[in-house]
């Protein structure tokens, strides 16, 4: 349980997937909430539709590695080419950051907490990505 939130396991996962362009600080934890209409229809079902990700930023792409609700790797990986990303916005709030962009005309709102209690690397990595302007190169 919660294996994908441990730094050693993340580094092992990077080696397994042979993604050499990933550094040790250019990833964060994030999630995509279900649409508001799902909350109106069936609240408990909407919570189950929440998608958790480890989000890796490279020069060529954004990689979304899906996690289950227990915080373990599911094996599903999405590679989003930076060439196909449009309308990229980054909004930093007090408790969470929103990364909003369009990919193939689909609007994605990725939310990421400023602090994750089980992952001390979250705040450090967010700060690193902001300083290096890695969210949009």
Annotated model-derived regions:
Residues 1-55:
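Anionic N-terminal interaction surfaces
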Residues 17, 82-96, 119-129:
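Short flexible/disordered coil segments
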Residues 31-35, 83, 106, 129:
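Short, surface-exposed, charged/polar-biased interaction segments
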Residues 42-54, 58-100, 107:
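Phosphoinositide-binding peripheral membrane targeting modules
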Residues 105-125:
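Canonical phosphoinositide-binding patch of PH/PH-like domains
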Residues 130-137:
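A membrane-cytosol interface segment of integral membrane proteins
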């Amino acid at each position: 349980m919660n294996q994908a939130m441990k730094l050693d396991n993340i580094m092992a996962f990077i080696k397994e997937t042979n993604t050499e362009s990933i550094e040790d600080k250019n990833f964060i934890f994030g999630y995509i909430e279900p649409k508001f209409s799902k909350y109106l229809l069936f609240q408990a079902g909407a919570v189950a539709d929440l998608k958790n990700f480890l989000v890796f930023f490279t020069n060529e792409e954004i990689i979304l590695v899906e996690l289950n609700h227990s915080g373990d790797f599911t094996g599903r990986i999405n590679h989003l080419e930076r060439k196909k990303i449009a309308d990229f916005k980054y909004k930093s709030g007090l408790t969470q950051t929103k990364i909003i962009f369009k990919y193939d005309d689909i609007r994605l709102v990725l939310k990421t907490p400023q602090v994750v209690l089980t992952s001390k690397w979250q705040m450090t990595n967010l700060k690193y990505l902001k300083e290096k302007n890695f969210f949009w190169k």
